[in-house]
Amino acid sequence: MFRRLIGVVVATALLTFQLIVGSATALELDEATRTVPLNAQGDTVTLSLKQVKEGKRLFQYACAQCHVGGVTKTNQNVGLEPEALALATPNRNNIEGLVDYMKNPTTYDGVEEISEIHPSLKSADIFTAMRNLTDKDLESIAGHILLQPKILGDKWGGGKIYY
């Protein structure tokens, strides 16, 4: 009888705590964290919380199969970390650069088009995950890619040592 009473008290305490705390909510990111480079000229844009959430969802849908954790499964030397994006030609360390890449991907040095082997809007007939993505969707995905180093630090694009 006493054990049952203890169990009821503990269950009541846990449920009361749950009501007070509320349901689990996503981490609220401040404006400074959500501000990412817009273009190569240095302009910036602050992503809305909706864009952050949508960018994560779309990245998981269309990109994470090959780029989980910001690495590139097919080429471990080139990931989605800020340094690699900045050294690409043209630069991919901003929203416009990444959107351009998702529309028409090129090799790291920018010399050859690789839309036949990398998902893009240009190759949406081959890579169906890209088929219904809009420019707004691509901007959200790019925002997600640029935001992750601010949240995860070196773990984003860090490779096997972190996963």
Swiss-Prot record:
GO terms for biological process: photosynthesis, light reaction; respiratory electron transport chain. It is a peripheral membrane protein. Gene3D superfamilies: Cytochrome c-like domain. One of its GO terms (cellular component) is plasma membrane-derived thylakoid membrane. The keyword Metal-binding applies. Heme c binds at C63, C66, H67, H118. Binds 1 heme c group covalently per subunit. It is found in: Cellular thylakoid membrane. It comes from the Bacteria. InterPro entries: Cyt_c-like_dom, Cyt_c-like_dom_sf, Cytochrom_C550, PsbV_cyt_c550, PsbV_cyt_c550-like. GO terms for molecular function: electron transfer activity; heme binding; iron ion binding. Its cofactor is heme c. Residues 1-26 form the signal peptide. Keywords: Electron transport, Heme, Iron, Membrane, Metal-binding, Photosynthesis, Photosystem II, Signal, Thylakoid, Transport. The keyword tRNA processing does not apply. One of the extrinsic, lumenal subunits of photosystem II (PSII). PSII is a light-driven water plastoquinone oxidoreductase, using light energy to abstract electrons from H(2)O, generating a proton gradient subsequently used for ATP formation. The extrinsic proteins stabilize the structure of photosystem II oxygen-evolving complex (OEC), the ion environment of oxygen evolution and protect the OEC against heat-induced inactivation. Low-potential cytochrome c that plays a role in the OEC of PSII. Belongs to the cytochrome c family. PsbV subfamily. PSII is composed of 1 copy each of membrane proteins PsbA, PsbB, PsbC, PsbD, PsbE, PsbF, PsbH, PsbI, PsbJ, PsbK, PsbL, PsbM, PsbT, PsbX, PsbY, PsbZ, Psb30/Ycf12, peripheral proteins PsbO, CyanoQ (PsbQ), PsbU, PsbV and a large number of cofactors. It forms dimeric complexes. This is Photosystem II extrinsic protein V. It comes from Nostoc sp. (strain PCC 7120 / SAG 25.82 / UTEX 2576).
